Amino acid sequence: MKNLILAIESSCDDSSIAIIDKNTLECKFHKKISQELDHSIYGGVVPELAARLHSEALPKMLKQCKEHFKNLCAIAVTNEPGLSVSLLSGISMAKTLASALNLPLIPINHLKGHIYSLFLEEKISLDMGILLVSGGHTMVLYLKDDASLELLASTNDDSFGESFDKVAKMMNLGYPGGVIIENLAKNAKLKNISFNTPLKHSKELAFSFSGLKNAVRLEILKHENLNEDTKAEIAYAFENTACDHIMDKLEKIFNLYKFKNFGVVGGASANLNLRSRLQNLCQKYNANLKLAPLKFCSDNALMIARAAVDAYEKKEFVSVEEDILSPKNKNFSRI
C-alpha cells in the first residue's frame, strides 16, 4: 500500500530525511546529519559550505531508506524560510525524486514544521498559544480553532537563539552557542554582573536582543583578561536576562489571551532554564504546557513529514516545474 511520505529538511545546517506513514503517523525512517563541527571553526554557518555538505549528505541518507520507495505516495520538502542555497539543495533533490517516482510534491514552511513537532504521533490540537524560539526566529503565535495562525509577537532584530550564538562568539567559545552558554552559566561561581531586561517598561508585544547583545559586548571590553570564571559569570547574567525578557513578554500575552494550552517549539526551546520558567508560568495561569521532545526541538525532517501528512489530506501539491524557493517568507497564516 502506498501510504508513506518522504520528507527532506535542509533549511540551514542540518541535513535530514524522514519517512512517515500518513495513516498511522508511525515513523518508518529518520536520519539527521549535523554540520555543527564543520561550521564551528567559522563561528557560524557558512551558506556555501552548508549547501555543499547537504549535497553530500542527502544522497547518502536516501540510499539508506531506498527499501521504502515502493510504498511512497508523496515527497515533501522544506521550501521556506531559510538559507537560499541550503533550501535549494533539498528542493532540487525532492523535485528529482518526485519526478523520477511520479509522485506529488508538497512544499512545507519550516516554521509550520516546528509547530508540528508538538504533534509527531497525534492529531494536531487547536486553540493554543505557541512560542517558537530558534536560531533564526523568535515569535509567539495563536493557533485558533479554525486552524488559522495569528502572530502575536516577534523580534525586532536578533532572535533568542541567534543572540546566544553571538555572545558565544564574542567570548571565543565556539559554535553553536546555545548549549555552550547554557553549560557555562551553570558553572558560574560569581553572580555580580547583571544586564537590563530589554523593553521592560514597554507595552509593545515584541522582543529585542540587540541591546542585550551590545551590553554583553561592553561588559566583555571591561575585562583585559577574560578568565573562565568571568566568562561563566557573563554567560549566567546573559542567559538569565534573555530568559527574563521572554517571560516578561509572555506574561503580558497570557494576561491578554488567557491561554489554556501553550506549546513551545524550536531549537532554542531545548534550553532548560527557559523550559523551567515556562512550566512555572503555565502553572501560574493554569495552562497546559506542551513541549516539543528534546530530540526534535532542532531542525529535523520528521516534523516536516508530519506537517506533510495534513498537507497531503488537503491536496496541497505543486508541480515539479514550479519555483517554490522562498528563503525569506515567514508569512504563514494557517496550519
UniProtKB/Swiss-Prot annotation:
Binds 1 Fe(2+) ion per subunit. One of its GO terms (molecular function) is iron ion binding. SUPFAM superfamilies: Actin-like ATPase domain. Fe cation binds at residues 110, 114, 299. Substrate binds at residues 132-136, 165, 178, 271. It catalyses: L-threonylcarbamoyladenylate + adenosine(37) in tRNA = N(6)-L-threonylcarbamoyladenosine(37) in tRNA + AMP + H(+). It is an enzyme of class 2 (transferase). Its EC number is 2.3.1.234. It holds the Pfam family TsaD. GO terms for biological process: tRNA threonylcarbamoyladenosine modification. It is found in: Cytoplasm. GO terms for cellular component: cytoplasm. Coiled coil: none annotated. Keywords: Acyltransferase, Cytoplasm, Iron, Metal-binding, Transferase, tRNA processing. The keyword Cytoplasm applies. Its cofactor is Fe(2+). Its main location: cytoplasm. HAMAP family: TsaD (MF_01445). Belongs to the KAE1 / TsaD family. Required for the formation of a threonylcarbamoyl group on adenosine at position 37 (t(6)A37) in tRNAs that read codons beginning with adenine. Is involved in the transfer of the threonylcarbamoyl moiety of threonylcarbamoyl-AMP (TC-AMP) to the N6 group of A37, together with TsaE and TsaB. TsaD likely plays a direct catalytic role in this reaction. PANTHER family: TRNA N6-ADENOSINE THREONYLCARBAMOYLTRANSFERASE, TRNA N6-ADENOSINE THREONYLCARBAMOYLTRANSFERASE, MITOCHONDRIAL. NCBIfam families: gcp_kae1, T6A_TsaD_YgjD. This is tRNA N6-adenosine threonylcarbamoyltransferase.
